Regions:
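Non-transmembrane "mature" sequence context
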Residues: 1-114
Length: 114
């Protein structure tokens, strides 16, 4: 079931498209088609699963930017991470694994201040 996309989600999609340099890059990160991101930006409904992915990506991204510069944060998302059992953070975003991601980011933050 689709529902109208709240303004906050549309705003997040727009901001993330800018942060990741294109709608195509955001679509790849979220594991959806580029046309779907375009529809969201035009106010089309978003399903709950993808809305959660957008929310999680925004949360992860904003926390990563407290630790890293944007290019390093992008690399962190795509790199294999030992704190995540040698999985890529981006795959956990797609799977909605918020707790594991935030735990890894907190560990990264603690290491950066140690």
């Amino acid at each position: 079931m689709l529902c109208s996309m709240p303004l906050a989600t549309a705003t997040k999609v727009q901001a993330l498209s800018v942060d990741f340099r294109s709608q195509a890059a955001l679509a790849e990160i979220l594991g959806v088609s580029r046309s779907r991101v375009t529809r969201w930006l035009k106010g089309a409904g978003i399903d709950p699963l993808n809305a959660e992915k957008v929310d999680l990506l925004e949360l992860v991204w904003s926390n990563l930017l407290r630790v890293y510069e944007p290019d390093a944060a992008r690399s962190w998302l795509w790199g294999v991470n030992p704190l995540l059992g040698d999985r890529r953070p981006i795959d956990l975003v797609r799977a909605g694994r918020a707790e594991e991601l935030m735990r890894a980011i907190r560990a990264e933050r603690a290491d950066s201040f140690a």
